Amino acid sequence: MKKISNGLKKIIAPAIAVLGLLALSSGAQAQYPNKPIKMIIGYTAGGAADKLIRPIAERTSKIIGQPFIMEYRPGAGASIALDITSKADPDGYTLHITDSGPMVILPNMRKLAYDPLKDFTNIAMIAGGGTAIVVRPDSAAKDIKGLIALAKKDPSKWSYGTSGIGGVGHLAGEQLNKLENLGITHVPYKGGNPAVVEVLGGHVPFLFSSLGAAATQIEAGTLKALAVTSLNRSVMLPNVPTLDESGYKGFDAAIWFSIVGPKGLPAEVMAKLVPAFNEVMKDPAVIKGINVDGYDMMPMTPAQMDALVIKDLAKWGRVIKEANVRDE
């Protein structure tokens, strides 16, 4: 056999090296994930985000072959968890269940260490839902138009409660306040359950409540839902009209939950995660659990999620500015 000339060796050797690197790279990509994945949660254990993500993570782990490890990092309206996620290595081993609060509302109210448009990769949309406008069954307001008429007649006797400043309920109330030029007072409480207790006790005339917080009372008949603030009717309250249907065309005030990672997740990581999460979101048991918690499914592609963040950042920015909403 003839010896390979030095010139030919110089050509072949680099080519072999490149092929070797490509093979190694391909092998590494095929192995993702090869260790547990951290799922950061910006609230305490047992909250809405935790309840939503656990069955999803459990089923997704069976598809991708690795477990999810829950890490709770509450504080600052869940912005701490998003900041941690933004600074994580974009290797697919740090994900985060976030929501519209720290993603599109808080950035309009305070200076944050992250940019919701530049620092994250949107992976999967989980679900969303509006708030319910609720009154006691003995209220003089029998429907949303009746409530507005009463509030206009004597604004000093009317106020609305919410779970706190800057929440979707508060901002929905400010939108309605502006549309009808009501001039009624916002009464923020420290959470959804305390707010429900106050409206039940007659201390506030009506409430913008999450469906989950008010569902038991609505079902029992101790609270009456006049309308929901999402664009579409809720699966939980199919007989309750939306504000859009009640004459406020285009009215849409809803919270949503999604799964994100740091900016720059590799294509091979997205190719594993996106189909896996999407498959789980079609599971009837997962859908039922999400509906029971007061949310509706919101199937979206990562590109559609990008567009939603842009749209909602602008929308809530306008509402916050017009209502002069100040951070707590």
Locations of regions flagged by a protein language model:
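N-terminal (or domain-start) structured segment
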Residues: 30-119, 157, 165, 181-208, ...
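C-terminal lobe and pocket-closing loops
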Residues: 128, 214-282, 311-314
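N-terminal signal peptide c-region/cleavage motif recognized by signal peptidases
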Residues: 24-27
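Bacterial N-terminal signal peptides that target proteins for export
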Residues: 2-15
